[in-house]
UniProtKB/Swiss-Prot annotation:
One of its GO terms (biological process) is chlorophyll biosynthetic process. Its EC number is 4.2.1.75. It comes from Arabidopsis thaliana. This is Uroporphyrinogen-III synthase, chloroplastic. GO terms for molecular function: uroporphyrinogen-III synthase activity.
Amino acid sequence: MALLLLSHCSILSFQPPLSSSSSFHSSHIQSLSKPVFASPSPIRNSISSSVSSSSSSVSSSNSIPQVVVTRERGKNNQIIKALEKNGISSLELPLIQHARGPDFDRLASVLNDKSFDWIIITSPEAGSVFLEAWKTASSPEVQIGVVGAGTARVFEEAMKSADGLLHVAFTPSKATGKVLASELPEKVGKRSSVLYPASLKAGNDIVEGLSKRGFEVVRLNTYTTVPVQSVDTVLLQQALSAPVLSVASPSAVRAWLHLIQNEEQWSNYVACIGETTASAARRLGLKNVYYPEKPGLEGWVESIMEALGAHADSSNPSSRN
């Protein structure tokens, strides 16, 4: 599939949206993907302080993309390629970027000063930030619990050269913070200690759930997400026309809603990476929301395809007869 890079025309700048709590269900449920109706310092140099949007995988300048992909710049390649394999065109429109959280500089020193029974990681970005601090702290021996397979993949390369010092030892039966907190194994005969490096905007399910079970939990807000500072208006118009918006975090949902706040008629389909994002999308008023039972790339693509199918059915009156 041909790759098209559109020239950047006028730029739309916008301020961060008002914060809103993140974290489902609805009157319409399907078995595979459940539709739910109803300027900080960058963490790494690869994140620029002023981000503009770019497009990918749109076959021609006059084509309407089928899906908008919205993860931060540099992290959309996997989903774009997976969609291409299924013949689905996409438009890359990064809505958020990661920035340092208030506890970013403390993480390495905490790892140096104290050992923990568990390190709990609930997102790929939290994993990447942790690995940087872990290396700075001279790579102490740690046992990792992750929320799902996508997060676990962040540690694969590091574990190959860690000589057993870094070990992913736990994944819950369902990829949510509540289930992780209810299933994390305890140390026999002692109070288990947990280090939880998290996003500033992450909810409290893990801390509350583990604390109720008697775990000692240290939470460090090591990173946060902020909206990109500018969006190309040409790309935004293309995005508004796309049948499906794909989102991977509640922050991306909020950024999109702030960006389109003057587009009262927008009611297209939303494909979320998992239940937490879908719950946030529903609470924020979006309809036609789809998500996979198990978060991850494969399930996300299936949800996108299901959303595209639902859009096609809604656009074809004869299909409903």
